Each structure stands twice: as structure tokens, then as C-alpha cells.
Amino acid sequence: MAPPLSPGSRALIALIRVYQRLISPLLGPHCRFTPTCSSYGIEALRRFGVIKGSWLTVKRVLKCHPLHPGGDDPVPPGPFDTREH
């Protein structure tokens, strides 16, 4: 079981949700990865917290450009993740 979310993680997840609901529908689907960068960001923040989760999210967004092939890029297992990948 993952630890409770910090206020910082909650705030960043809320910002990503605003993007998903208000901005992303206007831009249309253009993410090169599965899961999408915004879904990846939420999962990374939940698994790793605000510092490492933010770092993983920024790295992922920087890879999302036309010169990168994209594809399947899941969030790495977290310290409390007991599922096998």
C-alpha cells in the first residue's frame, strides 16, 4: 500500500487533472507514449511523491516530441509497489 499523498503531490495532481479536463480536449490527442504524459505524471506522483515524481514527469514530457519514436513507457515500480511488471 502506498503512503498517503503529500499536499504538494495533491496540488500537482490537481493541476494535471485541470489540464486533462480543460486544455487537453482542445489540443487533441498528440502524446507519443502509452500511458499519456499526464497519466504518467499522476502515477509517478502517487508512487514516488512530489520530488522524484516531478522529476520523472519532467523527463517524460521532454521526451515527448516528434523526433522520439514514443511507444510504451510505464512508470517504474515504486518502493511500495508489490505488483510484478
Curated annotation (Swiss-Prot):
Organism phylogeny: Bacteria, Pseudomonadati, Pseudomonadota, Gammaproteobacteria, Enterobacterales
Membrane-topology descriptor: Peripheral membrane protein
PANTHER family: MEMBRANE PROTEIN INSERTION EFFICIENCY FACTOR-RELATED
Keywords of this entry: Cell inner membrane, Cell membrane, Membrane
Source organism: Escherichia coli O6:H1 (strain CFT073 / ATCC 700928 / UPEC)
Any Gene Ontology CC annotation: plasma membrane
Protein name according to UniProt: Putative membrane protein insertion efficiency factor
Subcellular location: Cell inner membrane
Known function: Could be involved in insertion of integral membrane proteins into the membrane.
SMART domains named among the record's database cross-references: Haemolytic (SM01234)
Entry similarity comment: Belongs to the UPF0161 family.
